[in-house]
Amino acid sequence: MGRAFEFRKARKFKRWGNMARVFTKLGKEITIAAKQGGPEPENNPRLRVLMQNAKKENMPKENVERAIKRAVSKDFTDYKEMNYEGYGPFGIAIFVETATDNTTRTVANVRSYFNKNGGSLGTSGSLEFLFDHKCVFHIAKKEDLSLEDLELELIDFGVDEVEEDEDEVVLYGEFAQNSAIQKYLEENGFEILSSEFVRIPNDLKEVTPEQRESIEKIIEKLEEDEDVQNVFHNMKEDDSEEE
């Protein structure tokens, strides 16, 4: 489950081509977290971990501070988080997460991307069952850390997969248990390198190279939109590229 998702994420960042898009996405997340939980990271767990995300992506400190200040500004128009679900070409399910200050603009744009690229926008909640909503934590390795012991300890907190990479450990857990998992990690001295929410497809659909090209067009159009934060789908990745 996890490694395939990490590969998809790496491809998405490669498509974006520069860090400006990553910074825009992170900035919105930071602003939303500061608006909901306050601007002080010591009192706001979600903001705290997003600041670690920003550090990992080399986001300038002034960008982070600006995103936090935006949340407490009296002139700030609040972002509304909206999800859109639909089918792309060849029956590929596509789940779109947005953060916008103008929902009318956003839904019109998202619908046009589907319609102009052989897809159709569905009703809210219609495709949610096709994806598992997960939280993901990347933590620094500890000396003499037993992954088996850690996994057993975290089962009670909703963690269902633990993976080891060269420099870090990656935990996948239930979305609803995000706060509990973060609290456990912080209280037990684990360094959280980054954290995110993902939607992992329950089943992947095989496509031909020609079909893949059509599907990737709609995914790219969606990801290029400034209001779109994340795009998830159930198309199986090209095994030759993953290798």
UniProtKB/Swiss-Prot annotation:
This is Probable transcriptional regulatory protein BDI_1233. It comes from Parabacteroides distasonis (strain ATCC 8503 / DSM 20701 / CIP 104284 / JCM 5825 / NCTC 11152). Coiled coil: none annotated. Belongs to the TACO1 family. It is found in: Cytoplasm. GO terms for molecular function: DNA binding. InterPro entries: Integrase-like_N (IPR017856), TACO1_YebC-like_2nd/3rd_dom (IPR048300), TACO1_YebC_N (IPR049083), Transcrip_reg_TACO1-like (IPR002876), Transcrip_reg_TACO1-like_dom3 (IPR026564), YebC-like (IPR029072). Keywords: Cytoplasm, DNA-binding, Transcription, Transcription regulation. One of its GO terms (biological process) is regulation of DNA-templated transcription. Gene3D superfamilies: 1.10.10.200, 3.30.70.980. GO terms for cellular component: cytosol. It comes from the Bacteria. SUPFAM superfamilies: YebC-like. Its main location: cytoplasm. PANTHER family: TRANSCRIPTIONAL REGULATORY PROTEIN YEBC-RELATED, TRANSLATIONAL ACTIVATOR OF CYTOCHROME C OXIDASE 1.
